[in-house]
Amino acid sequence: MVYTSLSSKDGNYPYQLNIAHLYGNLMNTYGDNGNILMLKYVAEKLGAHVTVDIVSLHDDFDENHYDIAFFGGGQDFEQSIIADDLPAKKESIDNYIQNDGVVLAICGGFQLLGQYYVEASGKRIEGLGVMGHYTLNQTNNRFIGDIKIHNEDFDETYYGFENHQGRTFLSDDQKPLGQVVYGNGNNEEKVGEGVHYKNVFGSYFHGPILSRNANLAYRLVTTALKKKYGQDIQLPAYEDILSQEIAEEYSDVKSKADFS
């Protein structure tokens, strides 16, 4: 049963955003609730009342109701359970994506939107198949460490931490979320990280990604608001509401920490 897990306090909000947390009771291994909280924080700064629903096993995904869908990461066991449930949601999620619905997909969620992924054990798990990427495993190796990427289309830089065994390869109609400045990225080619397709943003960044990259959170929320209320909607600039939320490299954070 779909249920509301989080909602803005009552107030005079000019806008409303409905967020679907896909399998939020199962896929929350990497602090993904922090991404939900950041979406809510930024949306409220922009004048939007937020309602977050958990859409999980045997639930319908209402493509016309939700303005943002978040699909987080999980362990192989949970992902295999979800992979069995996803086909019932395929049509609605595919329609949502093709109609420019806003999606943030992290780690396992990113993998499951694609064609398939191969577990560390070598077992192939079928993905939802609504996007063209696929994920292979690797032997005795993981991509672990700090990572920095740059999105040339948006001229934005994102920072994160990666820890993944999978090697993801994008299809010809997909772009990476960003070009790798340092770190590994999607695979051993160390060229791109994540995916950007229509209004789908996928990444392997743990963290959670949005707490460290408020510029990306702002982009997701403003994209959703403009889609719902029109491109001419007047919204506060990023600098006006999030001037203190500057993305920082790990080295910068360490140098500013007070250990006294």
Swiss-Prot record:
Q: Give the residues the record marks as binding substrate.
A: 142
Q: Give the EC number.
A: 6.3.5.13, 3.5.1.2
Question: What does gene deletion cause?
Answer: Severe depletion of GatD/MurT produces a high proportion of aberrant cells, elongated or bulging.
Q: Which residues form the GATase cobBQ-type domain?
A: 16-214
| Active site annotation, chain numbering | 107 (nucleophile), 206
Which reactions appear under catalytic activity for this entry? beta-D-GlcNAc-(1->4)-Mur2Ac(oyl-L-Ala-gamma-D-Glu-L-Lys-D-Ala-D-Ala)-di-trans,octa-cis-undecaprenyl diphosphate + L-glutamine + ATP + H2O = beta-D-GlcNAc-(1->4)-Mur2Ac(oyl-L-Ala-D-isoglutaminyl-L-Lys-D-Ala-D-Ala)-di-trans,octa-cis-undecaprenyl diphosphate + L-glutamate + ADP + phosphate + H(+); L-glutamine + H2O = L-glutamate + NH4(+)
Pfam families for the chain: GATase_3
InterPro entries reported in the protein's UniProt record: Class_I_gatase-like (IPR029062), CobQ_GATase1 (IPR033949), GATase_3 (IPR011698), isoglutsynth_GatD (IPR054859), Lipid_II_synth_GatD (IPR043702)
Gene Ontology annotations of biological process type: cell wall organization; cobalamin biosynthetic process; peptidoglycan biosynthetic process; regulation of cell shape
Quaternary state and interactors: Forms a heterodimer with MurT.
- Protein family membership: Belongs to the CobB/CobQ family. GatD subfamily.
What does the record give as the function of this protein? Answer: The lipid II isoglutaminyl synthase complex catalyzes the formation of alpha-D-isoglutamine in the cell wall lipid II stem peptide. The GatD subunit catalyzes the hydrolysis of glutamine to glutamate and ammonia. The resulting ammonia molecule is channeled to the active site of MurT.
Q: Which NCBIfam families does the protein's record reference? A: isoglutsynth_GatD (NF045636)
Q: What is this protein called?
A: Lipid II isoglutaminyl synthase (glutamine-hydrolyzing) subunit GatD
Species of origin:
Streptococcus pneumoniae (strain ATCC BAA-255 / R6)
